[in-house]
Swiss-Prot record:
This is Metallothiol transferase FosB. GO terms for biological process: response to antibiotic. It comes from Staphylococcus saprophyticus subsp. saprophyticus (strain ATCC 15305 / DSM 20229 / NCIMB 8711 / NCTC 7292 / S-41). Residues 4-119 form the VOC domain. One of its GO terms (molecular function) is transferase activity, transferring alkyl or aryl (other than methyl) groups. It comes from the Bacteria. It is found in: Cytoplasm. Keywords: Antibiotic resistance, Cytoplasm, Magnesium, Metal-binding, Transferase. Its cofactor is Mg(2+). Belongs to the fosfomycin resistance protein family. FosB subfamily. Metallothiol transferase which confers resistance to fosfomycin by catalyzing the addition of a thiol cofactor to fosfomycin. L-cysteine is probably the physiological thiol donor. GO terms for cellular component: cytoplasm. The lineage of its organism: Bacteria, Bacillati, Bacillota, Bacilli, Bacillales.
Length: 151
């Protein structure tokens, strides 16, 4: 049985530059570092960085693939200003309905996309149920969220 996400690993082109970004900009707690690897705790998640200098990185900008972290709505402007003040590449977000809450999309030095989001999964489902009748919705409850009902 899958219990949870164990860790996320990103390939980076410059480990020192990436360590500074994750530690100083995202305020991740660094656990270990070497000349090619770094481990952090970020939002309760084990995040690993591995330096791989000689791989192409051009296609990453075309993908919507990203990792999102929850922030409080009251901290939204503060986070936006912090990223902007630190010259982080902030991306133009998609047009949103207010029921879908707020998001800031940005990239790390290698172009990996991140989102800081003020909503929850339930917020998104409630909004989609109201506005997207073409979607099929399935029932789920708190037990389903943790897979406790599976053997």
């Amino acid at each position: 049985m899958i219990q949870s996400i164990n860790h996320v690993t990103y390939s980076v082109s410059d480990i020192s530059k990436s360590i500074n970004f994750y530690k100083d900009i995202l305020k991740a707690k660094i656990l270990v570092e070497s000349d090619k690897t770094a481990y952090f705790i970020l939002g309760g998640l084990w995040l690993a960085l591995n330096e791989e200098k000689d791989i192409p990185r051009n296609e990453i900008r075309y993908s919507y693939t990203h990792m999102a972290f929850t922030i409080e709505e009251s901290e939204f402007e503060e986070w936006y200003q912090w990223l902007n003040d630190n010259n982080v590449n902030i991306l133009e977000g998609r047009t949103r309905d207010v029921r879908d809450k707020k998001s800031i999309y940005f990239t790390d030095p290698d172009g990996h996309k991140f989102e800081l989001h003020t909503g929850t999964l339930q917020d998104r489902l409630d909004y989609y149920k109201e506005e997207k009748p073409h979607m099929k919705f399935y029932e789920w409850d708190e037990v389903d969220k943790t897979d406790n009902n599976r053997e």
